[in-house]
Amino acid sequence: MAFGARGWRRWSLLLLLLWVTGQAAPVLGLAVSSELQIQRSFVPDECPRTVRSGDFVRYHYVGTFLDGQKFDSSYDRDSTFSVFVGKGQLIAGMDQALVGMCVNERRFVTIPPNLAYGSEGVSGVIPPNSVLHFDVLLVDIWNSEDQVQIQTYFKPPSCPRTIQVSDFVRYHYNGTFLDGTLFDSSHNRMKTYDTYVGIGWLIPGMDKGLLGMCVGEKRIITIPPFLAYGEEGDGKDIPGQASLVFDVALLDLHNPKDTISVENKVVPESCERRSQSGDFLRYHYNGTLLDGTLFDSSYSRNHTFDTYIGQGYVIPGMDEGLLGVCIGERRRIVVPPHLGYGEEGRGSIPGSAVLVFDIHVIDFHNPSDSISITSHYKPPDCSVLSKKGDYLKYHYNASLLDGTLLDSTWNLGKTYNIVLGFGQVVLGMDMGLREMCVGEKRTVIIPPHLGYGEAGVDGEVPGSAVLVFDIELLELVSGLPEGYMFIWNGEVSPNLFEEIDKDGNGEVLLEEFSEYIHAQVASGKGKLAPGFNAEMIVKNMFTNQDRNGDGKVTAEEFKLKDQETKHDEL
């Protein structure tokens, strides 16, 4: 060590033995300079501060006599020498030699006896009139008047919020001493340091140094030991009286009193309905942490996230943040961890993480919804309205609520033809085509439980999708009374069987029956149910008359509808 007048007592017995057994006497007659000699062996490029009288320093040294014989070394003790400068705790020459040094500077110092231990020396250790040479490396410097030093080297353009007392933060850091020696790093553990600020969970200097930081900000916080681990250090990696330097990157910030934050990005001009508790939503989202790290995205799966809201199917913050949205709206929802995944996190979401969801609402509905019909045009004569059993020809465009086109008969160049009320379209469409006249144009909105349900149509219609149909009715053929597939337009001949049985053999075959029915339809005397396969209707009619199933109908088997209610017959 660089000996103080009283510090010599701390020398170890080992060093004393080395001196007694191995140290040669000083060379007599050698001219000794009375001046302090300082050679700056290495000076760092950056030197923000130099030693002044009154500063506290920590340094390594090797002490030798002029002949090169070592008499002491801090390296041998694996500990720096720590002392105030200019307060008489050092020999005068060392007190002077340390002034003006930078951290990481190396000096060769030659101290004459008059600035060291003089003509008396130290009995048994330092001979009288000894010139002492010290190889000094300064590793730390601070002053009792120092405060926490903050140097911000990156600050994001947007800083809507800064750290306040009682906030909870997540940050990465590298912890070094003033000489750059690393003593700890959250990066090495691949885990942020998570803590409250300003309530005593941190060393005082860090509590102060974090205040005012923005998420995304990077700063260097330099802390004197009396605001860090003091004289004792931490008992492990940090020695006593060490100044600490923390290179901090703030990733996350919230307060336990925080609620969700909602920022509307795009709100459609027309918003006829806003989501309520109990509604079922389909939406896309990107989920990120506050520092922008992506943890999930519905877009990457090419599938919306579909859920009920207000019923606990999603985290509380999203349950709240999805209320009051419009179809087509884009909004940002910021969710504090106590309304997200809490202290434990989930999957790639770390514990105590604030979550940011950028959402796009595709559609929503309520299980109690029915279809919605908006008529855009009706012709002057709109007296004949569609009903169950009518045969309809119409054009349509089918889309999702966000405007995504699913299908169009106009693009196909042909109409869509159905018999109303016979399950040939989804229930919502069947309902939406009722009481419509030829030439009318209307928009029908169909909730999924009246459309294609949760399953949708693979590759065509997403599951749980609300559908929008823009319809134009082009043709309407009135159907038959319910339960009939064929009716007479006039009186039925009393000799009907004989008219069908042209060969008069008392038996009617399918060919005879079919020829006769088609002839009646062609002449306008009879009518088949429109929209169905005529041959199948005729065959079913014949089968119903063929009671014994022998492929022919006799006069005894032949009956009209009103004569036999169990069969759909003539």
From Swiss-Prot:
Catalytic reactions on record: [protein]-peptidylproline (omega=180) = [protein]-peptidylproline (omega=0)
Modification after translation (UniProt): Phosphorylated.
A Pfam family reported for this protein in Swiss-Prot or TrEMBL: EF-hand_5
Record-linked SMART domains: EFh
Entry keyword set: Calcium, Endoplasmic reticulum, Glycoprotein, Isomerase, Metal-binding, Repeat, Rotamase, Signal
Tree of life domain: Eukaryota
EC number: 5.2.1.8
Localisation: Endoplasmic reticulum lumen
A biological process from GO: protein folding
All residue ranges annotated as the EF-hand domain in the record: 488-523, 533-568
Top-level EC class as recorded in UniProt: isomerase
Function of the protein: PPIases accelerate the folding of proteins during protein synthesis.
Name of the protein in question: Peptidyl-prolyl cis-trans isomerase FKBP9
Organism: Rattus norvegicus
